[in-house]
Amino acid sequence: MANGWTGNILRVNLTTGNITLEDSSKFKSFVGGMGFGYKIMYDEVPPGTKPFDEANKLVFATGPLTGSGAPCSSRVNITSLSTFTKGNLVVDAHMGGFFAAQMKFAGYDVIIIEGKAKSPVWLKIKDDKVSLEKADFLWGKGTRATTEEICRLTSPETCVAAIGQAGENLVPLSGMLNSRNHSGGAGTGAIMGSKNLKAIAVEGTKGVNIADRQEMKRLNDYMMTELIGANNNHVVPSTPQSWAEYSDPKSRWTARKGLFWGAAEGGPIETGEIPPGNQNTVGFRTYKSVFDLGPAAEKYTVKMSGCHSCPIRCMTQMNIPRVKEFGVPSTGGNTCVANFVHTTIFPNGPKDFEDKDDGRVIGNLVGLNLFDDYGLWCNYGQLHRDFTYCYSKGVFKRVLPAEEYAEIHWDQLEAGDVNFIKDFYYRLAHRVGELSHLADGSYAIAERWNLGEEYWGYAKNKLWSPFGYPVHHANEASAQVGSIVNCMFNRDCMTHTHINFIGSGLPLKLQREVAKELFGSEDAYDETKNYTPINDAKIKYAKWSLLRVCLHNAVTLCNWVWPMTVSPRKSRNYRGDLALEAKFFKAITGEEMTQEKLDLAAERIFTLHRAYTVKLMQTKDMRNEHDLICSWVFDKDPQIPVFTEGTDKMDRDDMHASLTMFYKEMGWDPQLGCPTHETLQRLGLEDIAADLAAHNLLPA
């Protein structure tokens, strides 16, 4: 596989120390990334394996577009068994930054980590030179000190994915960090820690072969000038502007006159009006610190940054000298939940320092720098919501030993004092006391602390599944569409295909026109909190959303920006280009490709995930044992009937019908929700069908 793929799998057995090379072309029908990860895990990690068992594996997988220069393509899919949900089923972490590109430049599509080292090690990769190095001197350090030490030993160009103390201590809600703030979560930090693997350091010099460089350049120019919007591909500005027909205050296209990177080197830089067409100014459109934290963040913002080969720059970079008072660096940044979640635990809000709302900005940078250095992971904010629930409902007072409860500075919590966050995160990362079990995950604390139905049914806690994972653009995002999407994976679904479309900022009439073109009817698309009963078009919308995220996690592309469903260009009538993934695929690999073929590959990957989940759970009845939804989704807003303006609560009968229709659309058993022999055969998964049949896991 000379173009796009490298053709190489690097297998590292930590138990034996053996490092071997395999051919990745045997998995080509699964494209890459998520597809490679699921196939390797299905073949090699049997039911009954626990996440910290030596037999569990950690699969880092890229795709043919990774590192190619295609916009937003530096993603690595990390597949393993869940540390934090019921049943320890297969999950993925999705890590940006520079690690994925360096993997490809070094010559690897996949890195398989297996076994367990006798003592701490780190994996050193420089092109074809691969070795396991002693890491005793790194054990106990945070992700940043670890990265700095390894870069001193290797090169400033080395990209290091490291765990902190949380991963070392097998904290279920832990992850790994590369390039300072780019995380891979889902418990993968604890998996690395269980294997005594402190870090993977990669430096590559080979590049990625492109079949048609001229076409690649043309596609890049086309996407950058005609199609791409801002973060989450929002395609209208957040304020009325001279060039824009529409605006939406919720849009992440936040650039405007009078809004500055206030702490930029050399003096403030105005973001200004950024009409489409100029590739060099795309990076000004998204201003996440102000979007996430409010106007008080402006004076501390140095710039926006981001992943390799991404023009959007959704990662805030701030410099707040006062933060040093709390023992952390004054610089740092992130995006989305990681930017703002830390001060949400304060019942009365964070305490301000000098300016209005600066407590939120300062407190979150302190929290962010601690959280990332320890290698903790928030489970899409669920860790902090669980804290709030347990504090407000008196759970901590009930379950913590009296001595431990007395030594915690609850007065700091009430006062919004950032020092509480310091103590809280230290306890979590170092497994100090009963409180630290909060980072075991929602399912574990519900069992351990006997939280009962009140916990699962509490709407503000936002737990979607009784398996212990939260909503991620669920019923509030196109009702049944988001609800189906949130049922399908074994963690929060990490799917932005539908929410990017919903949040684009275009008016409802235009959105419904696009929905009709894509899904056959305007009825696919409802106004938020004014939704209608399920219909066939909504099912097609849900399937499209899921297949696109699987495709993006396979090729790999960032699903926070892709697909190009709509455009900022009035001259295109705001239409995007949903065949762009196939066009890039062809230009990079040289293989003839249509979007229909890629969609079929995505369906193969998605169905393999379903089949592996069936196998791990040892049940065919996915409807009643897996695709479960917490009661608050149906019981919220008791004064407003379903299908009435003002609510996004779901109807139980309608949701049952929605799942039945979706199962049929996928070719799964309409009652059980598991793949059929016919569908597995249609998708080229005959070996999976035979294996499931041998275990009596196919429907009659």
Language-model regions, residue ranges each:
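N-terminal amphipathic, basic-rich helices that act as targeting or association modules
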Residues: M1-P64, A70-C72, I163-Q165, H182
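Extended catalytic cores of very large enzyme megasubunits
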Residues: G4, I19-T20, S24, L65-C72, ...
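A generic structural signal for short, non-catalytic loop/turn and secondary-structure boundary residues
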Residues: A2-W5, L14, P51-A55, P71, ...
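Glycine-rich phosphate/pyrophosphate-binding loops
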Residues: G96-D128, S194-V208, N379-F387
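Feature captures the catalytic cores and cofactor-binding loops of soluble hydro-lyases/lyases
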Residues: K39-W122, V130-E133, F137-T147
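Short, glycine-/Ser/Thr-/acidic-enriched flexible segments
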Residues: L14-G17, S25-K26, G63-G67, T83, ...
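Structured core elements
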Residues: N8-N13, T20, V59, Q102, ...
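Extended C-terminal regions of large enzymes
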Residues: D53, S74-V76, C151-A186, M192-A700
